[in-house]
Amino acid sequence: MKVLLIKDVKALGKAGEIKEVKDGYGQNFLIAKGFAKAATNEVLRKYESDKKKEAENLRFEIANLEKLKEELSKITLEISKPVGANGSLFGGVTKDEIAHALKEQSHIEIDKKSLECDTFKSLGLHEVSVKLGHAIHAKFNINIKAE
């Protein structure tokens, strides 16, 4: 009997592969436990259709991330912080403050966990890197000014 593997099965194959197995193994174990489906024409057509939809969604998501990367590259955030008499910042600028400023000034919401930078402790222009997903990284600038 031919089965379409839904999940990876050790010593048999990976999800998405079509395998020839003995009837008892296919019916009583693979299909019963949810590891596979009988490889009928209908199941194969649905699997191919789902695979195409998934690929299209991935292309759409990557295109949106590339657009976001382009938008972010044009941004320079302005952040004002109190400074001491010697010109050093009190505390510094954290990822949380950068994410909040990005949302307030550019209306782009990014999780602070995806920002790749340390706390900035000096005035001036700094570059911030962002992990957007699917191996796409963006960079934007922040300008830290004295209050």
Curated annotation (Swiss-Prot):
Protein name: Large ribosomal subunit protein bL9
Record-linked PANTHER family: 50S RIBOSOMAL PROTEIN L9
NCBIfam families: L9
GO molecular function: rRNA binding; structural constituent of ribosome
Job description of the protein: Binds to the 23S rRNA.
Top-level taxonomic group: Bacteria
Signal peptide residue numbers: none
SUPFAM superfamilies referenced in this protein's UniProt entry, alphabetically: L9 N-domain-like (SSF55658), Ribosomal protein L9 C-domain (SSF55653)
The keyword Ribonucleoprotein belongs to this UniProt entry's keyword annotation: yes
Gene behind this protein: rplI
Cellular component terms per the entry's GO annotation: ribonucleoprotein complex; ribosome
Protein family according to the UniProt entry: Belongs to the bacterial ribosomal protein bL9 family.
Alphabetized Pfam families for the sequence: Ribosomal_L9_C, Ribosomal_L9_N
Gene3D superfamilies with a match to the protein in the record: Ribosomal protein L9, C-terminal domain (3.10.430.100), Ribosomal protein L9, N-terminal domain (3.40.5.10)
Record-linked PROSITE patterns: RIBOSOMAL_L9
Keyword NAD tagged: no
Record's keyword terms, sorted: Ribonucleoprotein, Ribosomal protein, RNA-binding, rRNA-binding
GO biological process: translation
